[in-house]
Amino acid sequence: MSNEEQAQKDDAQPVNEAAIDATAEQADAEVEELSAEQARILELEAALAASEATLAAQKDSVMRAIADADNVRKRAEGEVDKARKFALEKFASELLPVADNLERALQVADKENEAIKPVIEGVDITLKSFVSSIEKFGMKVIDPQGETFNPEQHQAMSMQENAELPANTVMAVMQKGYELNGRLLRPAMVMVSRAPEGGVDTQA
């Protein structure tokens, strides 16, 4: 190799080293930039996860609050309904003696006496109007004449042997019973038949 060629080679070597150094520095910068971006991504992902966890907790709290409010509302409605039913039952119970007195007046009145027939008719109309009015509010008369004795609605005041009726048949109603919205307000007071001693129960 001539001296001139050697000189050219020596002059080119610093240029190549400088280019390599520049490339290395650029690569390092890109790596640092990439690392910073990755760190930022991880930071954002962590923040997102924290936000989602907070949102889930808040959503759970809101749902619990809604459920609690709904339970409070239902309890309040139940208490109001109970209070209303209790007040209505008490009021209805106070009305029963009125119906009883009107019925007794009709039972003891002398229907053959022409002088009091208008009074009897007036009492009868009043009783029917009264019963019609209370039925509009959910009250129902229990008049089990001739029906099978039902201990859930009837109260047996006495029993009497009767060969013509099946045992446990309501022979007479001393006092009518009443229901209010399907609940027993007062049982009917009744006389119940029973099979004669030594006889055959016609229900068997």
Curated annotation (Swiss-Prot):
Subcellular locations according to the entry: Cytoplasm
Top-level taxonomic group: Bacteria
GO BP term, example: protein folding
Main location: cytoplasm
GO CC annotation terms, alphabetical: cytosol
Segments of skewed composition (Low complexity): 17-26
InterPro entries per record: GrpE (IPR000740), GrpE_coiled_coil (IPR013805), GrpE_head (IPR009012)
GO molecular function ontology, one term from the record: protein-folding chaperone binding
Bias kind Basic and acidic residues: ranges: 1-12
Keywords for this protein: Chaperone, Cytoplasm, Stress response
Pfam families in the cross-refs: GrpE
CDD domains from the UniProt entry: GrpE (cd00446)
Stretches for region Disordered: 1-32
Described purpose of this protein according to its UniProt entry: Participates actively in the response to hyperosmotic and heat shock by preventing the aggregation of stress-denatured proteins, in association with DnaK and GrpE. It is the nucleotide exchange factor for DnaK and may function as a thermosensor. Unfolded proteins bind initially to DnaJ; upon interaction with the DnaJ-bound protein, DnaK hydrolyzes its bound ATP, resulting in the formation of a stable complex. GrpE releases ADP from DnaK; ATP binding to DnaK triggers the release of the substrate protein, thus completing the reaction cycle.
PANTHER family (alphabetical): GRPE PROTEIN, GRPE PROTEIN HOMOLOG, MITOCHONDRIAL
Assigned protein family: Belongs to the GrpE family.
Subunit comment: Homodimer.
Protein name per its UniProtKB record: Protein GrpE
